[in-house]
Amino acid sequence: MKVLHVVTLHTPTNAFGGPTRVALNLARGLRGRGVDAELVTLGDGFPEGRLPEEVEGVPARIFRARHVLPRFEVSGITSPSLLAGARRLVRSADVVHVHLMRDLITLPVAVAALQCGRPLVLQTHGMIDPSDKPLAKVLDALATKRLLRRADAVLHLTEWERGDLEAVVGAGELARPVRLPNGTALHQPRVRSGPPTVLYLARFQTRKRPKVFAEAIPEVLKQYPDARFVLAGPDSGELAGTLETVRALGVENAVRHIGPLSHAEALEAFRAADVYVLPSVDEPFAMSLLESMSVGTPVVVRESNGLAPDIERAGAGRVVRRPEDVGKAVLELLGAEANQAASQAAWRLIRDELSLDAVLDILQGVYETATKDRSPASSARSASGRS
């Protein structure tokens, strides 16, 4: 079976975050099971010349991004050559798996898959929700609603996300919804050593609330004066403000900013940390949390995070209601007994419920159903039933 994983963007600094990480994890996992999975995406931030032909061992067709609508950021990038070859591309696949957002790449490729009669699986990563923005309304009218109604399966992370999708497309009109949590590989649990280390590893973006992380630092330093705080991830507009907050609080000597990390470097950063803090709001299902817990590093999240119920139930970290509670949660998890208990719980949560193998089992079942439903025999039966 050949599967195309279509995602909007890949950059050298992993600037697009979760959707690309999920696409790569799934494609790599599928290839390990004998599936011919490839990545199709735009590339940005690469030097002039030939673009990579594989990413982390996954064969990739990367087209150079053109910023045709800069004010819409990632939603405004496209590739004329990819769009021109979209129909030929989707015809080469047994299944087209699109990591869908309102943009000028994933929407057109998904439409091409429908038009060519290819089995189409959509995964929205919390990126499609009700919106009053004019561009969203136009794209929904032209493509989004039709795709959500006619796809062979629509993968959602949580019931909350499914509700958002139904609000966009209309009650009862969502095509074959299937809950597919994100999953990650399980790694050797970390061994705690050295001074206390607290990590922020995410985009520096308003929704991620990196300043909340910075504002918690003085409270932690009062009890752990040797604690170290690491800031990592690509800038999406909030880095300067976060560093200014650090300076204004007078804690710059305890803070290290290390910038964007590769996937391997990110895993090492999680392994070196005692606590990972992601203070973002309305985060559907952050891959960074899974990766932190996969090495046994406890996490601190806000209650609007899609993983908050699982983290709280398992005891894999702390869930806070207010931003001012982040410091207290970190202090609790820096205690030796609490840290060990949360570390073990985090690792078990990945092993038992959120492993990549469990996710791949579900996904392969979705693919098999989609291809059977599009088989000639199935089409003949459907036509007979309608006559």
What residue ranges belong to the model's regions?
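Conserved donor-binding/catalytic core segment of Leloir-type glycosyltransferases
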Residues: 4, 190-217, 230
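N-terminal strand-loop element at the rim of the active site
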Residues: 7-13, 29-77, 234
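Aromatic "clamp/platform" in nucleotide-sugar-dependent glycosyltransferases that forms part
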Residues: 101, 281
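Donor nucleotide-sugar binding/catalytic pocket of nucleotide-sugar-dependent glycosyltransferases
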Residues: 137, 143-189, 258
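Glycosyltransferase donor-sugar binding loop
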Residues: 201, 228-243, 259
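Active-site donor-binding acidic/aromatic loop of nucleotide-activated sugar
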Residues: 238-241, 252-262, 269
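Short hydrophobic beta-strand element within catalytic cores of glycosyltransferases
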Residues: 298-302
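Conserved acidic donor-binding segment of nucleotide-sugar-dependent glycosyltransferases
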Residues: 313-324, 332-337
